[in-house]
């Protein structure tokens, strides 16, 4: 028979009482009233904060955007097909954040910073809020260093500086993405980290861009954030902020970064969809009232850090699509007013074979020559004015039959200047090559050539300079000025090449 020992039992009870930990955990919960179209209405969640992450029973995460008197409007970061009416939801007490680290370089990720390239997990010890506040006035300095795009038309006439925000705007199929990707390709060896954000694009287009980067060795310094057309609107809306958070991580570590948002029209459309489903009042073009704030808080995060913060920079190139060249629509005017200038791509120029199809007349950089090296200022100072005058003359010359010699010469020079601005895709030029090309055109060396021969001559001239006059490149790179010695070297090269070119053409 088992004997009950009272002392042993009392010891066990005493031990259990001592070990008893009365931990009370308060969880802010609610119940799903309605779910559909990527939106859930929740009853409860009384203590939830605006922008707080909430977790559904089956694991889907959402963001509380609408805090109303009797329910909470939540946008889902997933399809939410398994969420049922009456299931429970709990507030996490966190705001959307992503892990950040150097390991993200060379990877393709989604808006939640999860890899989608099938190359395994990404290790990261730090995290950043997706919606970080933009740097204040004191922590910035004015833009003064050039960010070379490798495109003559931009670097000579619409220069972009490190820390600037320059809008690329144009109709569909006018080469907007090509300008942006060429700029990324040109950052090779420049110690610039690039982030390419694809919003609501076809998966095939994103794959094509990634393949180009891989083939040209640009993925080593690039992160691609992609939310394709079949992604939920919430993730398309978040993708640019995720890209900005990654770029900021490097900027605050005293590095230079370049971020491309391709494109913000689709982000605005995703936000409009979310807002209308949340029953927020629509405004102009059915966009919600805070669509300006959507883009301003994103683009204000691009900055040139002050010397106290290590002079890092984040340059933003947002892309906006127009409908049949209408720059006065709601989203284009908003983004034009936020950015420090715009590059306008024209469908007419593109169809006329002028590529990149940059309309120099209405494109502008509000930073201007502060973002150019001295050599480029010396050589390209007058070219924008000359081209603008040429465009005006050309329009006038269509109606006039007999033109005087000076006008004919000006038209001939303008046509050759326009020809030298043409460039193949994925073929960025160094600063020295650009300077030699512009100098040749603006000083009349191309006037004696037929228009069809201009590009061939310039390609051969650049090759000749590289092989026979390497000092030219060295002078430009080291002094950043167009010295007399550099000019002499260039003049000799042009004359030598012109003689060789003439002989070739005669054969």
Swiss-Prot record:
This is ATP synthase subunit alpha, chloroplastic. It is a peripheral membrane protein. Keywords: ATP synthesis, ATP-binding, CF(1), Chloroplast, Hydrogen ion transport, Ion transport, Membrane, Nucleotide-binding, Plastid, Thylakoid, Translocase, Transport. Its EC number is 7.1.2.2. It comes from Gossypium hirsutum. NCBIfam families: atpA, PRK13343.1. InterPro entries: ATP_synth_asu-like_sf, ATP_synth_asu_C, ATP_synth_asu_C_sf, ATP_synth_F1_a_nt-bd_dom, ATP_synth_F1_asu, ATPase_a/bsu_AS, ATPase_F1/V1/A1_a/bsu_N, ATPase_F1/V1/A1_a/bsu_N_sf. F-type ATPases have 2 components, CF(1) - the catalytic core - and CF(0) - the membrane proton channel. CF(1) has five subunits: alpha(3), beta(3), gamma(1), delta(1), epsilon(1). CF(0) has four main subunits: a, b, b' and c. It is found in: Plastid, Chloroplast thylakoid membrane. GO terms for molecular function: ADP binding; ATP binding; proton-transporting ATP synthase activity, rotational mechanism. The record marks 363 as: Required for activity. HAMAP family: ATP_synth_alpha_bact. The gene is atpA. It catalyses: ATP + H2O + 4 H(+)(in) = ADP + phosphate + 5 H(+)(out).
